[in-house]
């Protein structure tokens, strides 16, 4: 299946994603229903599934309108709320075969306690919501957020094949790289990508695979990068370094 990406240019800098082939469509975390409906109608597709990574408002606001148009579409989510009820409740390890494609579910709490991601192995794509961003990770401001769970979830993601491409829900490239450079100012990867993306529109920013993400993401590098021991000598690599970096990023 092909993957269509839109940038909404809103205050939260949301990306929106749709997977499609000649007949079928799958929507991920719809905020604006109209962009999906227009594309689906133009290409004469059938919306088969709506996948929800977590129940924050900017990931579910468009669900109700899409279901009013596409009566046969099924919602897949870990849990629901007042705005939507899943047709299929998913959990860690759930495998869903839609016939025209399939995906596996990973439970990755931390940003919020109901967070999952969707791994499309045939497409080599991971829709990771607000857990992993380009050069960063999700925040822990929600009531059910847990920084230690976020670390464990990140470790889980890093164990996937390196050629899989993560598709995050927001464009936070520049802010994340600026933070990383505030810790490791001379790092070649951080500087290279900062220069690469500085002049690019959000629609044109690169989609890198997990192997490359591991090099440009300071939170992944917190697991093993000895350069961080020089920058933050009071903290050991792994969970302790990750927690410290996430705390510093909160106030950056």
UniProtKB/Swiss-Prot annotation:
<dbReference type="InterPro" id="IPR035680">
    <property type="entry name" value="Clx_II_MBL"/>
</dbReference>
<feature type="binding site">
    <location>
        <position position="58"/>
    </location>
    <ligand>
        <name>Zn(2+) 2</name>
    </ligand>
</feature>
<dbReference type="GO" id="GO:0004416">
    <property type="term" value="F:hydroxyacylglutathione hydrolase activity"/>
</dbReference>
<comment type="subunit">
    <text>Monomer.</text>
</comment>
<dbReference type="InterPro" id="IPR032282">
    <property type="entry name" value="HAGH_C"/>
</dbReference>
<feature type="binding site">
    <location>
        <position position="111"/>
    </location>
    <ligand>
        <name>Zn(2+) 1</name>
    </ligand>
</feature>
<feature type="binding site">
    <location>
        <position position="130"/>
    </location>
    <ligand>
        <name>Zn(2+) 1</name>
    </ligand>
</feature>
<feature type="binding site">
    <location>
        <position position="56"/>
    </location>
    <ligand>
        <name>Zn(2+) 1</name>
    </ligand>
</feature>
<dbReference type="InterPro" id="IPR001279">
    <property type="entry name" value="Metallo-B-lactamas"/>
</dbReference>
<dbReference type="GO" id="GO:0046872">
    <property type="term" value="F:metal ion binding"/>
</dbReference>
<keyword id="KW-0862">Zinc</keyword>
<comment type="pathway">
    <text>Secondary metabolite metabolism; methylglyoxal degradation; (R)-lactate from methylglyoxal: step 2/2.</text>
</comment>
<feature type="binding site">
    <location>
        <position position="54"/>
    </location>
    <ligand>
        <name>Zn(2+) 1</name>
    </ligand>
</feature>
<dbReference type="InterPro" id="IPR050110">
    <property type="entry name" value="Glyoxalase_II_hydrolase"/>
</dbReference>
<keyword id="KW-0378">Hydrolase</keyword>
<feature type="binding site">
    <location>
        <position position="130"/>
    </location>
    <ligand>
        <name>Zn(2+) 2</name>
    </ligand>
</feature>
<feature type="binding site">
    <location>
        <position position="59"/>
    </location>
    <ligand>
        <name>Zn(2+) 2</name>
    </ligand>
</feature>
<comment type="function">
    <text>Thiolesterase that catalyzes the hydrolysis of S-D-lactoyl-glutathione to form glutathione and D-lactic acid.</text>
</comment>
<feature type="binding site">
    <location>
        <position position="170"/>
    </location>
    <ligand>
        <name>Zn(2+) 2</name>
    </ligand>
</feature>
<protein>
    <recommendedName>
        <fullName>Hydroxyacylglutathione hydrolase</fullName>
        <ecNumber>3.1.2.6</ecNumber>
    </recommendedName>
</protein>
<dbReference type="Pfam" id="PF16123">
    <property type="entry name" value="HAGH_C"/>
</dbReference>
<dbReference type="Pfam" id="PF00753">
    <property type="entry name" value="Lactamase_B"/>
</dbReference>
<dbReference type="GO" id="GO:0019243">
    <property type="term" value="P:methylglyoxal catabolic process to D-lactate via S-lactoyl-glutathione"/>
</dbReference>
<dbReference type="InterPro" id="IPR017782">
    <property type="entry name" value="Hydroxyacylglutathione_Hdrlase"/>
</dbReference>
<dbReference type="InterPro" id="IPR036866">
    <property type="entry name" value="RibonucZ/Hydroxyglut_hydro"/>
</dbReference>
<keyword id="KW-0479">Metal-binding</keyword>
<comment type="similarity">
    <text>Belongs to the metallo-beta-lactamase superfamily. Glyoxalase II family.</text>
</comment>
């Amino acid at each position: 299946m092909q993957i269509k990406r839109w940038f909404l240019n809103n205050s939260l800098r949301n990306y929106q994603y749709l997977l499609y082939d000649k007949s079928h469509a799958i929507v991920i975390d719809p905020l604006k229903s109209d962009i999906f409906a227009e594309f689906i109608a133009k290409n004469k597709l059938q919306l088969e599934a709506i996948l929800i990574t977590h129940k924050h408002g900017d990931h579910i606001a468009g669900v109700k309108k899409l279901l009013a148009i596409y009566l046969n579409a099924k919602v897949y989510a870990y849990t629901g709320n007042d705005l939507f009820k899943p047709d299929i409740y998913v959990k860690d390890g759930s495998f869903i075969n839609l016939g025209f494609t399939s995906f596996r579910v990973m439970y990755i709490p931390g940003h919020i306690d109901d967070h999952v991601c969707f791994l499309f192995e045939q497409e080599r794509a991971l829709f990771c919501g607000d857990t992993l961003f380009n050069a960063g990770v999700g925040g822990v401001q929600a009531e059910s957020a847990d920084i230690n769970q976020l670390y464990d979830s990140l470790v889980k993601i890093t164990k996937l094949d390196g050629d899989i491409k993560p598709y995050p829900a927001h464009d936070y490239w520049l802010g994340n790289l600026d933070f990383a450079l505030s810790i490791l100012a001379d790092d070649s990867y951080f500087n290279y990508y900062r220069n690469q993306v500085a002049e690019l529109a959000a629609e044109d920013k690169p989609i890198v695979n997990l192997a490359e993400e591991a090099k440009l993401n300071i939170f992944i590098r917190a697991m093993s990068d000895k350069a961080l021991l020089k920058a933050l000598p009071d903290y050991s690599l792994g969970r302790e370094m990750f927690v410290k970096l996430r705390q510093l990023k909160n106030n950056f």
